[in-house]
């Protein structure tokens, strides 16, 4: 499906749900109240593994899953678990840095988080983006435009890095989101997933992890929205297993 068709589908879908928009707003507020707000994980930097060569550098940047909501420390969250997996693959130490913030979209990642990135070159960059572009109803055109800009910034500043991108959220599996808001957001998440698959295809050393079909969601959730420590471990392992097929470590 072309970008224009996705955009048209998004606009028509918005028009269709407009009559129940007040109900959806109330439903969303109630769900947010039920979920509450988890704290960020502690210790956003670390080193894992060992090897004869100097440590490689991994940057993990993005939304609440990058901030580690649902885990006690980043070592047990997405950043640390991804670094552990990379270290095992390259048989070398990985120096990892996490920059995450709850609620950020791709645009806010550019504006608010990228200025915080250390002035150094990274060998690997993992973008944990997409959940809030779904939750905050970014259109397909906005999603593509902002992600292409973010990928371009990463590439311009880290020309030799491999860029990995986590999947758009698996909202359909969330045990806390009620219908009809779950179905509406899931349809948008699937649309953003297909969109990013299309526009990253053929990009040099840019790898997107499509919405998975092989993740066991038993014990995955901390609060119904964010992963638990087990969820982060399983998620990172599944992503890296997918990247193994497309990236030569």
Regions found by a protein language model. Give the residues of each.
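Short, flexible, glycine/charge-rich loop motifs used to bind or transfer phosphoryl groups or to couple energy/partner
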Residues: 46-49, 87, 115, 153
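Conserved SGNH/GDSL esterase-like catalytic core that processes O-acyl groups on lipids
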Residues: 55-59, 65-146
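Alpha-helical cap/lid subdomain in secreted, periplasmic
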Residues: 114-249
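Residue-level detector of flexible, active-site-proximal loop/helix-junction positions
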Residues: 26-29, 103-105, 170, 213-215
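Short glycine/proline-rich turn/loop motifs
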Residues: 62-64, 217-218
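N-terminal secretory targeting modules
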Residues: 1-59, 240, 244-247
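Short, flexible coil/linker segments at domain boundaries that flank nucleotide/cofactor-interacting
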Residues: 51-53, 91, 158
């Amino acid at each position: 499906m072309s970008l224009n068709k996705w955009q048209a589908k998004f606009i028509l879908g918005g028009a269709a749900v407009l009559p129940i928009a007040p109900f959806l707003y109330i439903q969303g507020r109630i769900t947010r109240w039920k979920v509450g707000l988890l704290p960020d994980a502690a210790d956003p930097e670390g080193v894992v593994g060992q090897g004869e060569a100097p440590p490689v550098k991994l940057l993990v940047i993005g939304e609440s899953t990058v901030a580690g909501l649902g885990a006690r420390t980043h070592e047990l969250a997405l950043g640390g678990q991804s670094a552990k997996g990379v270290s095992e693959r390259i048989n070398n130490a990985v120096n990892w840095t996490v920059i995450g913030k709850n609620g950020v979209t791709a645009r806010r990642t550019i504006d608010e988080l990228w200025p915080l990135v250390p002035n150094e070159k990274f060998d690997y960059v993992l973008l944990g983006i997409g959940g809030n572009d779904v939750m905050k109803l970014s259109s397909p055109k906005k999603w593509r435009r902002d992600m292409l800009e973010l990928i371009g910034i990463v590439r311009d500043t880290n020309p030799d890095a491999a860029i990995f991108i986590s999947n758009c959220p698996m909202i359909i599996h969330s045990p806390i989101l009620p219908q009809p808001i779950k179905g509406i957001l899931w349809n948008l998440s699937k649309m953003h997933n297909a969109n990013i698959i299309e526009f990253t295809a053929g990009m040099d050393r840019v790898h997107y992890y499509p919405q998975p079909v092989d993740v066991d969601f038993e014990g995955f959730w901390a609060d119904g929205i964010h992963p638990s420590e087990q969820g982060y471990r399983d998620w990172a392992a599944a992503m890296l297993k997918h990247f193994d097929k497309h990236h030569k470590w």
